[in-house]
């Protein structure tokens, strides 16, 4: 039994559901890999907010609250998407699709985590961070999952806003306010989400089509999709450069180099489709994770070292 990309993988013969299997099912509902990526952006945001002098206990408390919020939102997303997860090969091994965890129990689990995240952040950080976390969960579940996901090909554009909120929560936990660097970090992730998700959707187009989810690759041509990927990749890189106004030389250098690499990959995908070649969009999906991680790790190091900045925030 193991977890992979939020899926419950059962390597043993079918049989009664044991305690360990059930426990792994609950863990899978929270989508640990997704949480990992979200939390990678929180620490750099907090370090930038106070140029590396943040209380370690505040960082830990914010991460715990963010983990609870993301786990709760992901679990509730799985509850709402249980019907379509059964129809997609990529998600057919998730706990609810396989009935490893009762749907009602998953709902209670998700709600409990969500409520716990609010009160944890309220008691250990501040009210603004708690409200931002609560609003993020509500937006992700009610607006993205229930309203947008099955109705529009632009679902991930607007729904992706939920994935941008960890930087806002991290910043507000330190400062008690929202300032323009936090908004720029929000935009970085907002613009990064469509090319990241659409590249995956290109690879699993048949899955989404079978489930009736109108992802852009399902309703548009590959050339149209890769053109949109290219546009959002450029916007992502430009946003990372805008953030360089409030960072040191280390972040700025990494943002330029990593951004160039990300743009080259997006242009190669677009050019390959335009020439009618067989392309591998999953490569862009995987490398986009690395890109975001590299940029935010550079931001964390730059901020921790308190390198001289172009502008003082």
Swiss-Prot record:
Its EC number is 2.5.1.141. One of its GO terms (cellular component) is plasma membrane. It catalyses: heme b + (2E,6E)-farnesyl diphosphate + H2O = Fe(II)-heme o + diphosphate. Keywords: Cell membrane, Heme biosynthesis, Membrane, Transferase, Transmembrane, Transmembrane helix. Its main location: membrane. It is an enzyme of class 2 (transferase). GO terms for molecular function: protoheme IX farnesyltransferase activity. The chain crosses the membrane at residues 34-54, 56-76, 105-125, 128-148, 152-172, 173-193, 237-257, 291-311. Belongs to the UbiA prenyltransferase family. Protoheme IX farnesyltransferase subfamily. This is Protoheme IX farnesyltransferase. It holds the Pfam family UbiA. It is found in: Cell membrane. PANTHER family: 4-HYDROXYBENZOATE SOLANESYLTRANSFERASE (PTHR43448:SF7), PROTOHEME IX FARNESYLTRANSFERASE, MITOCHONDRIAL (PTHR43448). It is a multi-pass membrane protein. GO terms for biological process: heme O biosynthetic process. It comes from Mycolicibacterium gilvum (strain PYR-GCK). Pathway: Porphyrin-containing compound metabolism; heme O biosynthesis; heme O from protoheme: step 1/1. Converts heme B (protoheme IX) to heme O by substitution of the vinyl group on carbon 2 of heme B porphyrin ring with a hydroxyethyl farnesyl side group. It comes from the Bacteria. HAMAP family: CyoE_CtaB. Carbon 2 of the heme B porphyrin ring is defined according to the Fischer nomenclature.
């Amino acid at each position: 039994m193991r977890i992979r990309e939020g899926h419950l993988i059962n390597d043993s013969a079918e049989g009664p559901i044991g305690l360990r299997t059930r426990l792994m099912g609950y863990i899978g509902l929270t989508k640990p890999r997704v949480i990992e990526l979200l939390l990678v952006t929180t620490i750099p945001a907090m370090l930038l907010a106070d140029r590396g002098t943040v209380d370690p206990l505040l960082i830990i408390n914010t991460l715990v609250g963010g983990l609870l919020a993301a786990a709760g939102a992901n679990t509730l997303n799985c509850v709402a998407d249980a019907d379509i997860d059964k129809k997609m090969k990529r998600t057919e091994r998730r706990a609810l699709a396989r009935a490893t965890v009762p749907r009602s129990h998953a709902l209670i689990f998700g709600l409990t985590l969500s409520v716990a995240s609010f009160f944890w952040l309220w008691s250990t950080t501040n009210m603004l961070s708690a409200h931002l976390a609560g609003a993020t969960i509500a937006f992700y579940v009610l607006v993205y999952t229930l309203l947008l996901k099955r109705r529009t090909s632009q679902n991930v554009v607007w729904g992706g806003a939920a994935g941008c909120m960890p930087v806002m929560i991290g910043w507000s936990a330190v400062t008690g306010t929202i300032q323009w660097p936090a908004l720029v970090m929000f935009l970085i992730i907002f613009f990064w989400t469509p090319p990241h998700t659409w590249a995956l959707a290109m690879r699993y187009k048949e899955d989404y089509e079978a489930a009736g989810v109108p992802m852009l690759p399902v309703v548009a041509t590959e050339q149209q999709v890769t053109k949109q990927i290219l546009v959002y990749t450029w916007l992502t890189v430009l946003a990372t450069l805008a953030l360089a106004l409030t960072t040191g030389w280390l972040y700025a250098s990494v943002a330029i180099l990593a951004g160039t690499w990300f743009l080259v990959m997006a242009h190669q995908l677009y050019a390959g489709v335009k020439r009618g070649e067989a392309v591998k969009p999953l490569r862009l999906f995987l490398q986009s994770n690395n890109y975001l991680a590299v940029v935010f790790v550079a931001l964390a190091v730059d901020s921790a070292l308190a390198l001289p900045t172009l502008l003082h925030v």
